[in-house]
Amino acid sequence: MKSVINKVNRFPIIFRSFQYRNYRLFFGGQSLSLIGTWIQRIATPWLVYHLTGSTFLLGMVAFAGQIPTFLIAPFAGVLTDRWNRYYILLGTQIAAMIQALLLAFLYYTGTIEVWHMVILSIILGCINAFDIPSRQSFVVELVDKKEDLGNAIALNSSMVNGARLIGPSIAGVLIAFTGEGMCFLINGLSYIFVIISLLLLRVNPRKTNTNKQPILKELKAGLSYVNKSLPIKYIIFLIGLVSLTGMPYTVLMPVFAKEILHGDSHTFGFLMGASGSGALAGALYLASRKNVLGFGKIISMAATLFGLGLIAFSFSSSFYISLGLMVLTGLGMMLQMAASNTVLQTIVDDHMRGRVMSFYTMAFMGTAPFGSLIAGILADKIGVPNTILLGGIICVLGALIFISKLPELRKAVHPVYVRLGFIPAEISSGIQEASEFSATPNE
C-alpha cells in the first residue's frame, strides 16, 4: 500500500495517470505518432490547393476523408463492444502507416493526382471509423481507478494538441523546403512508435460480449440507450452541431492564410499552431481538475467561446490578431470536446461504451465531411470570411440551446454521480444540483 502511495506522489495531480505503466507507454507512443499525423493533416489540404487552386476541391477531399466515419462508425462501435479493442487498435495503426507511405510513394514518383488523394482519404476515413471509438474506449483499460479516467482523457487531449501545436509548425517548414512528400513519409514512419508501444503493453484480455445479437439490433439498442440519457443525447447533439458548422474553418485555413492574410505555408502552419496552443491550454486545465463536477457549465461556456472566436476571426485581416483569435478558438474547441468526452466516458455503462463513443465519433468527425463540403461550396459563393462567420453564429446558438437544458441535465446526471461516489448520497438535493453538472468550474 505504501509503495502505491509513493508512486502516486511522484506525479503532480495534473499528471497522475502517469502512475500507470500502460498509460505511460501508450501516451509516449501516441505522442510521437500524432506529431506525424498533424504534419500530414497540414500537408494534405495544402497540396490539394497547390494542385488545383479550388476551395471546392479542398472541401471535397475533406469530405472524402470523413464521410466513412459517418457511415461506418456506428457499426464499428458495435464491433468495438464485441471484439478486443487492443487488436483493433494495433490493426488500425498498421493500416494508417501503409496509407501514409502510399501517399509519399505517389508524391516522390511524380504521379500523385487529386483523385489519388480522394481515394486514400476515403481509406483513411474507414480506418479512423474503427480507430477512434476503439482508442477512446481503450483508455478505460489503461487506468485502474475510475476517478483517474477524466485525467487520462484530458492528458490524451493535451497529447493531441501538443502534437497539433508542433506538427503544423514542422509541416510549414517541410512544405517550404522539401515539399509535401516528406510530410507523408515522416507520418508513415511515426506509426512505428505507437505500434511498438502497443506491443509493450501488459493488458488483461477484456471480456468480450458473448451474447451477440444481429449488428442492426445491437445498433438499435445503442441508439435507444443514447436517446434515453438526456446528458449523453444533448452532449452529442452539441458536438455534432459544432463539428458540422464550426469545425470546417480548418478546411478553409489555406485559403484564409493565402488570400486574406496574404501569407504562405508558414502562415497556415502558424495559424493552426496557434489554435493548437489554445487547445493544449484547455486540455491541461481539464487535466488539473479533480473530477468531472462542473463539466456541464464548461461545455456550454466553451462552445460559446468557440463560436465567438470564429465570429471575430472572420472579420480579421491582421496576422497577429488572427493568431490571438485562433488561440481562443482552439481553447474553446478543446474545452468542449474534451469535457464532453470525459462526461460521456464517466457516465456510460461499459457494455455500451463502444457504441456511445462511436456516436461521439460520428458527431465529432462524421458530421465534419458535410460541413467541409458545404463550407467549400459556400466559400465559392459568399467568400471564406462570411462562411466562417455563419458557422460561428450557429455554434453560439447551439450553445444557448444547451445552456437552456442544463437544469434538466443536472437532474439526470445526479444519480449517476452519486452511484460513482463523486457526490455523497446524504447531501441535500438542492446542494447536489448546484454542485455537479453545471457547478462553477473552479474545483
Predicted regions and their residues:
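Transmembrane alpha-helix termini and helix-breaking/packing motifs in multi-pass membrane transporters
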Residues: P45-T52, L103-T109, I166-I186, E259-I260, ...
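Juxtamembrane intracellular "pre-TM" segments in multi-pass secondary transporters
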Residues: K2-Y23, V203-F237, G421-I431
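Structural signal for membrane-spanning alpha-helices in multi-pass inner-membrane proteins
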Residues: P45, A100-Y107, A171-A176, V194-R202, ...
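Helix-loop boundary and gating motifs at the non-cytosolic
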Residues: K7-P68, S224, K228-S275
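Substrate-agnostic recognition of the 12-TM MFS/MFS-like secondary transporter fold
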Residues: R24-T44, G65-T80, N84-Q99, H116-A176, ...
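Helix-loop junctions on the cytosolic side of multi-pass membrane transporters
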Residues: S137, E141, E180, F184-P214, ...
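C-terminal transmembrane bundle of multi-pass solute transporters/carriers
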Residues: V61, L71-F75, R82, I88, ...
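Short, conserved catalytic or interaction motifs in soluble domains
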Residues: T37, G53, F63, T69, ...
